[in-house]
Amino acid sequence: MTSVLLLRLAGPLQSWGALARFDRRDTLNRPTKSGVSGLIAAALGLDRTDDLGALTDLRFAVRADRPGIAVRDFHIVGSGTYPLRPRDLITDHRRAEKAAAALDTSTGPVFGHLAARSVTKWYGAPKEVAPDPKTGVLLAGNTTRDAMMTTRWYLADAAFVAAVEHPDQDLLYRISDAVEHPKRLLWLGRKSCPPSGTISGGVHPGTAETILTTTALLPNATSPQPWAWIEATPGTPGAAQRTDQPVTYHPEGRTHTARWETRTRVSPEPTIGWDIIP
């Protein structure tokens, strides 16, 4: 027999990456298995290089009680002039020498106020910092850079109910305790998206399908029949493939494989309620 741990995933912003290049980072319309498994791994205190063990065997489902609103965050990074900072005098002595005259004659605040015009082609975040082959002093190999434009998508004011199913009830209880007393910082897809309030909805006997159907809607749910995505076995009629089954989160070789899921409307007839701090 299996049991299910309910997870309340709510916060001002969430972002569950479908595409993660530097210049464009999308979000799906619901949490991914990889993202939620990563949150669980962080709560348990696992390193990125650690084996995921039983976490790879969790069966995953998610219900969109409040889908939220997609918002775009547009950034322009680099180019232009930047205030001088103390670290800038350390990372390249050539720039420090050029700034010395202005530093010596300044009578007011210097750092954060002295602009780049006294230092030709100054850029405030040096790249390619390495020791000078002749002197051993740190030099910035790239002190100029064209502006970079990035677009990042988020879900605003969304709330989801995730269900993770496993036959080992003790494992689910450990996860339930860990998400409320995490060993590492937790986030909803990205580091800029912390969760709010209570996360654990408790451990309940049953399958992901039955528990999502018998669990009350979260406050301010937008529909009495929300959509749910439920992990399925390959070949299940109507199932779609998703490549978000985590294998490893190793920073030098993060790997995911395919899994299958179905999408359906659920009409909760609650016997399980929520005792949450928003």
Annotate the PLM regions:
Residues T2-L7, R24-N29, R117-A130:
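Generic detector of short, locally flexible boundary/turn motifs and exposed helical patches
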Residues P12-L13, P31-V36, D132-V137:
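N-terminal start-of-chain detector that recognizes signal peptides
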Residues D65-P278:
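Internal, well-folded beta-alpha domain core
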